[in-house]
Each structure stands twice: as structure tokens, then as C-alpha cells.
Amino acid sequence: VEEALEKIKKKRGCINISDLAAELGYNQSYLDRLFYAATGMSMKKFSTIVRMQSAIRYLQEDKTDEVYEKLGYYDQSYFIREFRKYTGMTPRQWAKKSQKRIV
């Protein structure tokens, strides 16, 4: 489980869970059960959290329209929905709000 955690963090959450399980020599559902038992969340949920934390960092430096591609999202509207679930606002709203705090 520690190795799975580290690999997800290293890839900024941009990782295929079934490929990760195979790489670690586990069945995906078995590894996900182990992961859930150790962390209290699924690997997909953890991966999404890592991606959203990366998005927040990228939004401080990059244009909002570029961030979703850097994080491996193919659909910008899906990224916006995920970001809104995580932060309560769109990436653009978050970027504007964080710029006001910096200035």
C-alpha cells in the first residue's frame, strides 16, 4: 500500500489504477481493498485528491485552460466538475480568489 501511495503521489494522481495494480503484482480489486483498509478511501478517490492538490499548485502559475491537460484530463468540463466538487468553486474562480490573497 505504501508503494501504491508513493507512485500515485509521484505521478500527481495521473495514473491508471489497473496498470498500477499490475505493476505491483496485485489484482486491482484486491489492492483497492488493501488500500481502503489502510487509508479509509479508494485508490481512485486518493488519486483524485492528489490531482486536485496538483491543480491548485498549477493554478498559481499556469493559465486555467492548461491545467487540466497537465493533469491528464481529456475533458475540460469533467475536470471543472471534479475541481468544483473538491474546492466548491471552478478553477477560474479559485485562481481569481487566490490572486486576491497574494496581492
Q: What function would you assign to each model-found segment?
A:
Residues 1-44, 62-71:
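DNA-binding recognition helix and immediately preceding turn/loop
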Residues 38-74, 97-103:
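Terminal helix-turn-helix DNA-binding modules in bacterial transcription factors
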Residues 82-103:
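…primarily DNA-binding HTH/wHTH and HhH modules…
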